[in-house]
């Protein structure tokens, strides 16, 4: 793949799910599986469900903590079955299709994080990610099986990659450092602006960070915006 995307599982409970995810990854051309948790999750059941994707399990990387699993990544995407709304600006998700439309523009190492089967990702884990994705499902039963959720998201990314096989990206995507500097400049600008009420400043910072991460801006655009916040 042109872009490096890791699938990250946080404390998975069922070996069968891990094996099924390995199979799905191979179906759609993804190679790196990262697991936060114990190596014992990969057992005979996992290999049985993986079928011909054993090498994905053999090469899986294990981490003790969430922070370690995402530490070397440039862009991290959280997944959640619980949707945010207009009143919850920290949890405004995009759909897998919207993610696929954007993700091929990203340069660097990307991680897509999937939470625990029973209660998903914790809020503090989601807050450490750059983007939140949620799969539209029926309100009667919105939470999907873990391996099915992985399949939906990887399918959308793969089909978009196929449709855009010869896509040429002319502008360099803003690096992680570019974005962090832009956000820091904006935060400093907000802190110094006496016209903005104190109780709204933190909200402005949260919204701007989300906008920057959702927009996939170029390096040139990031530096142009920075000049406005001096």
Curated annotation (Swiss-Prot):
Its main location: cytoplasm. GO terms for biological process: tRNA nucleoside ribose methylation. One of its GO terms (cellular component) is cytosol. It is found in: Cytoplasm. InterPro entries: Alpha/beta_knot_MTases, RNA_MeTrfase_TrmJ/LasT, SpoU_MeTrfase, tRNA_m1G_MTases_N. SUPFAM superfamilies: alpha/beta knot (SSF75217). GO terms for molecular function: RNA binding; tRNA (cytidine(32)/uridine(32)-2'-O)-methyltransferase activity. Pfam families: SpoU_methylase. Its EC number is 2.1.1.-. Homodimer. Catalyzes the formation of 2'O-methylated cytidine (Cm32) at position 32 in tRNA. This is tRNA (cytidine-2'-O-)-methyltransferase TrmJ. It comes from Methanocaldococcus jannaschii (strain ATCC 43067 / DSM 2661 / JAL-1 / JCM 10045 / NBRC 100440). The lineage of its organism: Archaea, Methanobacteriati, Methanobacteriota, Methanomada group, Methanococci. The gene is trmJ.
